[in-house]
Design a protein with these regions (language model features):
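Intrinsically disordered, low-complexity
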Residues: 1-20, 126-127
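Solvent-exposed, polar/charged alpha-helical surfaces in well-ordered, non-transmembrane soluble domains
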Residues: 7, 11-15, 36-40, 70, ...
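Solvent-exposed polar/charged
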Residues: 15, 43-44, 89
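Catalytic cysteine-centered active-site loop
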Residues: 19-71
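Aromatic- and glycine-rich peptidoglycan recognition patches
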Residues: 48, 63-64, 78, 84-85, ...
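Structural motif
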Residues: 72-73, 94
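Short beta-strand segments that buttress and anchor functional surface loops
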Residues: 73-79
Length: 127
């Protein structure tokens, strides 16, 4: 992604904060799950069609090291005992935005949070 598109991804993801979480959700008016949020944000802000589950998205993107990660890249976690079972959008400064759960909805988190740091799988970027 170009720097402009990356910035658009971050801005769009921040605009989704506090939206509802809905399992399998992919739409603004009904809410999002983690992959639905990523799919919606990438389509709206960068024109990129990135569909499927978090694991599907991991297969379609390229692993990068933490030093190479830029705002707009994807960050993956193992939350269900399986690799890449959760995805969020990296916004820089050690933070990411994701659709967490029905109680909290779309929120911003820190990667160094004890829950997320234990489950961190890695950063990935579009090819």
């Amino acid at each position: 992604l170009s720097q402009d598109k990356r910035q658009d991804v971050v801005i769009q993801s921040m605009a989704m904060l506090d939206r509802n979480y809905t399992y399998g959700g992919k739409k603004l008016h009904t809410g999002f799950d983690c992959s639905g949020l990523v799919s919606f944000v990438y389509k709206q802000s960068a024109g990129v069609n990135l569909q499927g589950s978090a694991a599907d998205m991991a297969k379609r993107t390229q692993a990068i090291d933490a030093q190479s990660a830029q705002p707009g890249d994807l960050v993956f976690f193992n939350t269900l005992g399986t690799p890449n079972s959760h995805v969020g959008i990296y916004i820089g400064s050690g933070k990411f935005i994701h659709a967490a759960n029905e109680r909290t909805g779309v929120r911003q988190e820190r990667l160094d949070n004890s829950y997320w740091s234990k489950r961190f799988e890695g950063f990935r970027t579009l090819n």
